[in-house]
Amino acid sequence: KPKISMNILLLGSGGRECALAWKMSQSKKLSKLFIGPGNGGTAAYGTNVALKPTDFAAVSEFVVANAIDMVVVGNEDPLVAGIYDYFKSVDALKDVLVVGPSKAGAMLEGSKDFAKEFMLRHGIPTARHLSVNSENIAAGEAFLESLKAPYVLKADGLAAGKGVLILDSLDEAKSELRLMLDG
């Protein structure tokens, strides 16, 4: 039988978490809302708590101590680190609902290279790409030369939505590629 009211822990500290906290706070099914670590905006909708979302031991202690029914993972870092899998592997946490994918599923967000290979493997339309590292910069530059502007460079891994450069100049794209890989 579903619970009539729930204690929820929302993990994260950005604007996304503020929007989620605002909407969750309107639910009649919400008993208590905690946001870890939260921000100034989230404090208006629940209780901010000093939690680092990737510190699974501290998060799990808080969940048990506060009878949390659901954990909503707002940002990508704990998902890529495997928080869903962690909760499902600990007996005291198995029944806690975790909103977010497993570590394997989070790779679609956590690695642009993995996501591109996944799309190709499954016939999902996507733009042409080449994965470049410091050992094949020349191949990366040659690939850029085969394209027309705009040139799109993406860093692999999490970048908080800021890992993409869109450039109109081939020379600038080559320069930025070298900067991304050589520092």
What annotation goes with each model-predicted range?
Residues 62, 142-143, 176:
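CheY-like receiver
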Residues 110-143:
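Short, glycine-/small-residue-rich phosphate/pyrophosphate-handling segment
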Residues 4-101:
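ATP-binding N-terminal substructure of ATP-dependent carboxylate-amine bond-forming enzymes
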Residues 12, 132, 164-169:
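Short beta-strand-to-turn element immediately C-terminal to the catalytic PLP-Schiff-base lysine
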Residues 70, 125-128, 146-152, 168-183:
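Conserved ATP-binding module of the ATP-grasp superfamily
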Residues 119, 147-167:
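ATP-grasp fold ATP-binding core
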Residues 52-55, 111, 135-136, 169:
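Acidic/polar helix N-cap motif
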